[in-house]
Amino acid sequence: MNPSTTQARVVVDELIRGGVRDVVLCPGSRNAPLAFALADADRAGRIRLHVRIDERTAGYLAIGLAIAAGAPVCVAMTSGTAVANLGPAVVEANYARVPLIVLSANRPYELLGTGANQTMEQLGYFGTQVRAAISLGLAEDAPERLDALNATWRSATCRVLAAATGSRTANAGPVQFDIPLREPLVPDPEPHGAPTPAGRPGGRPWTYTPPVSFDQPLDIDLSPDTVVIAGHGAGTHPNLAQLPTVAEPTAPAPDNPLHPLALRLLRPKQVIMLGRPTLHRPVSALLADPQVPVYALTTGPRWPDVSGNSQATGTRAVTTGAPSPAWLHRCEQANRHAVAAVRGQLAAHPLTTGLHVAAAVADALRPGDQLVLGASNPVRDAALVGLDSHHIRVRSNRGVAGIDGTVSTAIGAALAHEAAHDGRTVALIGDLTFVHDSSGLLIGPTEPTPRRLTIVVSNDNGGGIFELLEQGDPRFSDVSSRVFGTPHDVDVGALCRAYHVESAQIEVGELAAALDEPGPGMRVLEVKADRSSLRQLHAAIKAAL
């Protein structure tokens, strides 16, 4: 067995021992040793291999697989720009704390700076965005040292896994594992081959690292009128469950929900912030109010204080006191009023908007389903229409909240969800998000494909979120409609046909029935929506409060 093949097989075996079950592979010549080793592991049923031609979407497919499976996922590619195309996914994985392992094949390092083809300084390319950038030395053709090399390769692979999963830091995230490979890049003929050097007995990892966790208890008195703000990565806090909670869709479902717009009707005396809230301006205003003490509870090491207003930080609350019944009743009434205001104005509004589409999707979900939300308006709309996330799983790329890669994320999340659960996956995304990652629809005929994924495209022909921001002020209409609205006139049905994906254009009133249809496989449901009246609709909702 030649050195590159031996090294690749050892690395793949150790990744599997460390918990990797899904790997995304992009074709190339330099990563051929890894490709052959991964294909062998796939045939043996040890991993599930997903082959993609676009590294950018491959990275987001891996993110979807990782967040839904709760396990590290690798994406392997050849050298050069193939590595650079992982940039957006690596950044998202960094801030969302997703265990993404970039297996970047490289030319031998002595070729750097010589003009060698498809060669660049790719080790360390991702800079501060990765937990670690780790390299293996070139595999030596030294049979007499194979035991020592085997130990070195396996130990390095375990180091990669520990960094990605955060087992020593409680801070999961992306890792670059750069592997220079020398020719020959394909396996030797079998009769002259040799078995892969062995790992630990019983399939154990070479170096086991038990997971560490932070524990920073924070004393909090619940007697003052308190609200909880739960953002992405909030975690569960049973001793806070009785408190009124503004929960973003990706946070754990609250026992005592409080609509984000209800904050306008209340004057809390203190706030407990969980995770990283990013969606609602009333929430941001409350967290920045110097008259309201804020206690921030997070599960990771990042500083959780955008406004500089937090009085203390920790990982869990040690509570004393109890909220007054009068405060709880007042919050319950405010929540009911806000929910009714939103639904009432939706019913009265003459045009279909993204909010209407979000309400139809939210109302059609069933226990066991998984919901993937686009990072622009859809995740906000789901919160505003009162999504009940009990008994469903909600995903959204909230690390840096870009719209890129959302189709691929949804496909990865669906594949992981179906491997462990019976429920469907429904993705709600906007048209720009869909078009931006339309290449994610490309799944080859030999590749694993979601069995129950429906992508709902709320199509208002452009960037609806800008209608609600300062750029959407009517004063700027002569400019904003073009440079922010970015109308595109893409034929969604034709785009889906190009990728052999079933699609249909339906009205919002038909969405619930369409989602209930069994429809095995992956499909797209397009709902035409209007964005020109979004500003008017949101103003009417605020007035109804």
Swiss-Prot record:
Residue ranges, annotated region (Disordered): 184-209
Cofactor: record remark: Binds 1 thiamine pyrophosphate per subunit.
UniProt key word Phosphoprotein: no
Composition skew (Low complexity), residue ranges: 195-205
E.C. number(s) listed in UniProt: 2.2.1.9
Reactions catalysed: isochorismate + 2-oxoglutarate + H(+) = 5-enolpyruvoyl-6-hydroxy-2-succinyl-cyclohex-3-ene-1-carboxylate + CO2
Cofactor names: Mg(2+); Mn(2+); thiamine diphosphate
GO MF terms, alphabetically ordered: 2-succinyl-5-enolpyruvyl-6-hydroxy-3-cyclohexene-1-carboxylic-acid synthase activity; magnesium ion binding; manganese ion binding; thiamine pyrophosphate binding
Pathway annotation: Quinol/quinone metabolism; 1,4-dihydroxy-2-naphthoate biosynthesis; 1,4-dihydroxy-2-naphthoate from chorismate: step 2/7; Quinol/quinone metabolism; menaquinone biosynthesis
Database matches in InterPro entries: MenaQ_synth_MenD, THDP-binding, Thiamin_PyroP_enz_TPP-bd_dom
RNA-binding found in the keyword field: no
HAMAP family per the UniProt record, alphabetical: MenD
Similarity comment: family membership: Belongs to the TPP enzyme family. MenD subfamily.
Subunit structure, as described in the record: Homodimer.
Function (record text): Catalyzes the thiamine diphosphate-dependent decarboxylation of 2-oxoglutarate and the subsequent addition of the resulting succinic semialdehyde-thiamine pyrophosphate anion to isochorismate to yield 2-succinyl-5-enolpyruvyl-6-hydroxy-3-cyclohexene-1-carboxylate (SEPHCHC).
Name the UniProt record assigns to this protein: 2-succinyl-5-enolpyruvyl-6-hydroxy-3-cyclohexene-1-carboxylate synthase
Gene expressing this chain: menD
